[in-house]
């Protein structure tokens, strides 16, 4: 499994090389957003296959950003690694804030996936030249506001801000606080986070500036260049100085946007006033952020079906199977070939309901389906489909109670479920494995699957038709 580390101030310098060349144009693909909103996003990072992997946890739900490649990074391999990490953790892969440019690849990647693309998530993207010039009739309103500001504030100038300007910034935040009208906890928290971002100017990650007039700052902004996009994390100005906001937008874009094609002024946070303001600056595009929640073929089932063969019935486990199923699960001698020790996941005392409860919970979560193998109504074993790869393949296993071994029941049950999985459930592939020294299982699997490869421990099989 991947090892994730929480995003901290120190981590920003580690994330920055990936975001510095990132071409996704969305604000979430920046070190500043990951750090500024760390308590909301609960972001953690890992590196695999030459790509940065960000895992967030929102409202208790784990979700990933789209992989950000470094030099030579393999996004396809990174996606597969994340899928495998989710499989091992027993959670479904969810990729959020996926840029529209990459969405087509993901839409074709998984057989079952739910896609969401909401207006409220979209970033406001502007041509850098448009904001730096405000040229043409469509920007006449902004120019009028700026002309008024310049007339009322002769000598006002834009200055870059560095760590040496802490005194100026301290005075500005005091002035801004005196005018700040919003009383909601969220607004107050956002202001505190904005102030904190200016304490990290020594990292070299951010571009910051302000409008200085008569020795005091009237406006400040802080941004981060990611690929060809300047992502504006903070914009604050004193409302009492009419026209200061459009003046700041233009001056900041003119000073820092020369090496950028795009300026991202982030989303509107579902705020009517922010949406109105951002639209007035005439965005060239709204940067879509798409969410992909990956499903599996088991999602289509309302209940576990009943299958029949010449001698057997395969159906859901019932309470009447408790004793026989517990005996099957507790047979350590036989289960050494099963490849799984229940003690690994057991938390607390082992109860008589534990094993049946696990099968029911796994099906409820649609991560596995367990069939009881019945001979004349008696439970003599199980066949399980589990370990899905989210791309149309699942692993299958079978075990038969020792007193019923040697009669071909395992082969009969295994073949029936494999056929059902391919032609009724709709899987693309069923895979299985057995220990190299497990000759009976090798013979069973060879009779109904294709032997594909071996390693030092296992022999592997697959069934496509």
How would you describe each model-predicted region?
Residues 14, 217, 226, 263, ...:
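Acyl-donor (CoA/ACP) binding surface of acyl/acetyltransferases
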Residues 111-182:
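Acyltransferase donor/substrate-recognition loop-hinge adjacent to the catalytic core
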Residues 28-99, 212-241, 385-391:
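Conserved donor-binding loop and adjoining core beta-sheet/short helix segment
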Residues 102-115, 269-286, 411, 436-453:
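Conserved active-site alpha-helix within GNAT-family acetyltransferase domains
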Residues 206-293:
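Aromatic (often tryptophan-rich) hydrophobic motifs at membrane interfaces
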Residues 2-14, 137, 157-171, 313-327:
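A short beta-loop-alpha structural element at the N-terminal edge
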Residues 74-78, 240-251, 404, 408-417:
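Conserved acetyl-CoA pyrophosphate-binding loop and the N-cap/start of the following alpha-helix
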Residues 89-99, 258-266, 424-433:
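Conserved GNAT acetyl-CoA-binding A-motif
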């Amino acid at each position: 499994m991947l090892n994730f580390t929480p995003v901290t101030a120190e981590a920003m310098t580690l994330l920055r090389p990936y975001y510095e060349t990132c071409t996704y144009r969305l604000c979430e693909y920046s070190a500043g957003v990951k750090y500024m909103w760390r308590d909301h996003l609960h972001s953690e990072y890992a590196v695999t296959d030459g790509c940065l992997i960000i895992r967030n946890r929102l409202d208790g739900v784990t979700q990933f950003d789209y992989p950000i490649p470094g030099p030579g990074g393999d996004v396809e391999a990174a996606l597969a690694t994340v899928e495998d990490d989710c499989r091992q953790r027993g959670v479904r892969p969810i990729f959020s804030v996926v840029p529209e440019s990459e969405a087509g690849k993901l839409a074709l990647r998984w057989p079952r996936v739910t896609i969401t693309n909401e207006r409220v998530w979209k970033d406001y993207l502007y041509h850098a030249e448009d904001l730096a010039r405000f040229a043409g009739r469509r920007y006449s309103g902004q120019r009028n506001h700026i002309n008024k500001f310049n007339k009322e504030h002769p000598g006002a100038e834009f200055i870059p801000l560095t760590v040496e300007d802490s005194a100026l910034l301290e005075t500005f935040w005091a002035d801004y606080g005196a005018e700040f009208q919003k009383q909601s906890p969220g607004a107050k928290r956002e202001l505190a986070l904005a102030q904190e971002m200016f304490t990290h100017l020594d990292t070299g990650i951010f571009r910051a500036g302000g409008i200085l007039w008569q020795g005091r700052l009237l406006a400040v902004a802080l941004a981060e260049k990611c690929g060809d996009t300047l992502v504006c994390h903070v914009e604050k100005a004193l409302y009492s100085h009419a026209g200061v906001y459009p003046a700041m937008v233009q001056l900041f874009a003119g000073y820092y946007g020369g090496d950028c094609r795009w300026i991202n002024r982030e989303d509107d946070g579902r705020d009517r006033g922010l949406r109105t303001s951002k639209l007035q600056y005439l965005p060239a595009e709204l940067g879509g952020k798409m969410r992909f929640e990956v499903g599996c073929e088991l999602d289509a089932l309302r209940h576990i079906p009943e299958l029949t063969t010449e001698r057997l019935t395969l159906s859901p486990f019932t309470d009447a199977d408790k004793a026989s199923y517990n005996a099957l699960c507790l047979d350590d001698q036989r289960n050494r070939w099963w490849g799984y020790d229940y003690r690994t996941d057991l938390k607390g005392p082992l109860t008589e309901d534990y094993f049946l409860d696990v099968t029911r919970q796994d099906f409820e979560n649609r991560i596995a389906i367990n069939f009881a193998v019945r001979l004349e109504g008696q439970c003599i074993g199980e066949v399980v489909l589990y370990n899905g790869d989210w791309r149309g393949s699942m692993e299958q296993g079978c075990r038969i109670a020792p007193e019923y071994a040697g009669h071909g029941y395992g082969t009969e049950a295994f073949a029936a479920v494999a056929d059902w999985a391919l032609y009724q459930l709709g899987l693309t592939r069923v895979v299985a494995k057995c220990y190299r020294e497990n000759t009976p299982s090798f013979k069973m699997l060879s009779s109904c699957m294709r032997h594909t490869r071996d390693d030092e421990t296992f022999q592997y099989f697959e069934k496509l038709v």
